[in-house]
C-alpha cells in the first residue's frame, strides 16, 4: 500500500508485524509517556489518551506526517491490567483471568501533523479463558512471555491454548485492531486510494 510518511509510535514487534502484514510501509519511532491512569479515568478514555499522547510525542521526535500511537489494556472485573511488574504480578493476573471472560481494549490515534488533528478510536474484544491450572500458569510465566504484554498474555503465542473463544477483533487482542486502523489511515489519506 502506498503511504504518505507513516510513523508507528511503538516499539511493539507485534504492532509492526500487523502493519507489515497489511502491506503498510512505516517507520518506528517509539514514544515514552507516563502511562498511569488518572484517578477515576474510564478505561476507554485511558487508552485513547495514551494512544494520542504517544502519537503526538512521536511527532515531536521525528519527521513525517502521520503518527500512529496505540495502547492496549485488559479489563477484568473493573481492574485495568497493563503489563505485569514481575512474576508474582503475572501470576495474580493470570489467576484472575482464569475461567473468566474479560475485555481487551485498544485505543489508537493517528495524528496528522499537516492538519494538526488526530483521529482517535477504541476497540473492545471479549476474550474467554478456560480454567487454568497452577502448573499451566507457572510454566507460561517461566517462558518470560507475559512480561511485556497487557494482562500477562499473548494470544498469538504461548497463551493461545488458554483462550476458549473471542468475540470481536483478533488483531485487537494481539495489540492493534488492524481492520479499523487501516480504514482510518485510508479515510485520512495516509494510504492513497
UniProtKB/Swiss-Prot annotation:
The EC number(s) attached to this protein equal 3.6.1.9
Disulfide bridges in this chain = none
Requisite cofactors: a divalent metal cation
Which Pfam family, any one, appears in the UniProt record?
Maf
Cross-referenced SUPFAM superfamilies, in alphabetical order? ITPase-like (SSF52972)
Q: Where is the active site?
A: 71 (proton acceptor)
What keywords does the record list, in alphabetical order? Cytoplasm, Hydrolase, Nucleotide metabolism
Q: Which domain of life is it from?
A: Bacteria
Gene3D superfamilies noted in UniProt: 3.90.950.10
The EC category is: hydrolase
Q: Would I find Cytoplasm among this entry's keywords?
A: yes
Select a single GO molecular function from the record's annotations and give it.
Answer: UTP diphosphatase activity
Q: Which GO terms describe its biological process?
A: nucleotide metabolic process
Q: Name one GO cellular component term.
A: cytoplasm
Q: What are the boundaries of the signal sequence?
A: none
In this chain, the site described as Important for substrate specificity is at: 14, 72, 156
Supply the InterPro entries for this chain. Answer: ITPase-like_fam (IPR029001), Maf-like (IPR003697)
Q: Does the keyword Cytoplasm apply?
A: yes
Catalytic reaction equation(s): dTTP + H2O = dTMP + diphosphate + H(+); UTP + H2O = UMP + diphosphate + H(+)
Q: Could you tell me where this protein is found in the cell?
A: Cytoplasm
User: What function does this protein fulfil?
Assistant: Nucleoside triphosphate pyrophosphatase that hydrolyzes dTTP and UTP. May have a dual role in cell division arrest and in preventing the incorporation of modified nucleotides into cellular nucleic acids.
What is stated as this protein's family in its record? Belongs to the Maf family. YhdE subfamily.
Protein name in UniProt: dTTP/UTP pyrophosphatase
- Species this protein is from: Citrifermentans bemidjiense (strain ATCC BAA-1014 / DSM 16622 / JCM 12645 / Bem)
